[in-house]
Amino acid sequence: TGLLSPSESAITTGNISYAVTCFTDFGQQQVHGKLNYRMNHFGMQNFDLNFNGGIGKNWLYNAGTYQNFDPGSFKLQFTDYADRTQIYHAGLTRILGEGKGYISLQYKHANSKNPGNFANAAPFIYVGDGSIKKVNGFDPGRDSYVPRNGAYTYTDIMNGQQKTWNFNKGSENRSHEVALLSNYRFDNGLQWKFDAKFMYVPVANYVDFGGSTISEVTAADGYTLDENGQNPYEGLIEGRRTWLHFGKVTSGMFTTELNKQFGRHAVRLGLNEWYYHLNYHSSSLQWTGTVERYPQVLYGMATDPTDPTQTAKRTQFYGFNE
């Protein structure tokens, strides 16, 4: 990695600010490898493996993988990991003109499931002096406030169909990336750079959880633990809203630059072309949950706006896409 000054960033990217640049390690003729490993007392294991070497005189290869197995600081009942990330990359590089330049083709695949992003909410009582008190024995940071069943029913805003959303897949992101990188310095001192990248993201999902005021209910309020209404619930509840974000991304970019030094002056001519297309939609739903670790989704009476009879029914999920 490297740091660009505001002036350099303005010239190369059009942004007047400090910018961080990243460089790919194409490798070397001798076989070289590196392994980093980390763990913590919650059971997280993380390793990063990279190796490279030469093929013949003017060819280099590089490959590597990043793996993260992070169960988080509390157990999620619907999955083993709060963050399960996998990244694989490989590349092939040709050295040009006895070291005057190179051309390299790189590929990267990433797959990340990170339900920990939406699992950090917690109920508590704020004392006022910076400290908090527990609610119903709930221990923030060590207990999960995500429903135990691991799935929701929602109405797809694109076609109106009732579907089931799985907590684990709802936070999934997958991507494929191909990059062509080249750099060559001519005998007259002129240097030419050309970099191009294409990225396709077939799955780019995210989840937002919202809440409301915590209140206490009795059997007379009509909340039950079963669909038949035979098991009334009494205790603390919180009305919750959930937004399910679904996306697909296609992007491409290339940058080319000619530069040459004339005495104390540097002349630079370049072109940047960037393309980004996002196919995005969001569906939302409401539900009422118990206030406890691994809360239960309660049944209550609600009306479906698409029902021509407008008859109230006992359901766990309601208020779709409102």
Ranges and model annotations:
Residues N46, D70-L76, S112-F118, W192, ...:
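Outer-membrane beta-barrel proteins
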Residues S5, Y37-H41, Q67-P71, L96, ...:
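Transmembrane beta-strands of outer-membrane beta-barrel pores
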Residues N173-V203, E234-E322:
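Face-selective signature of the C-terminal outer-membrane beta-barrel domain
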Residues L4, E8-A90, R94-G101:
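Outer-membrane beta-barrel translocator/receptor signature
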Residues V31-L35, Y61-A63, G101-L105, W192-A196, ...:
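Transmembrane beta-strands of outer-membrane beta-barrel proteins
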Residues D80, R84, H89-G97, Y102-A179, ...:
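Acidic/polar loop-and-plug regions of large Gram-negative outer-membrane beta-barrel proteins
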Residues Y18-V20, G211-S212, Q286-W287:
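Glycine-rich, phosphate-binding/catalytic loops in enzymes
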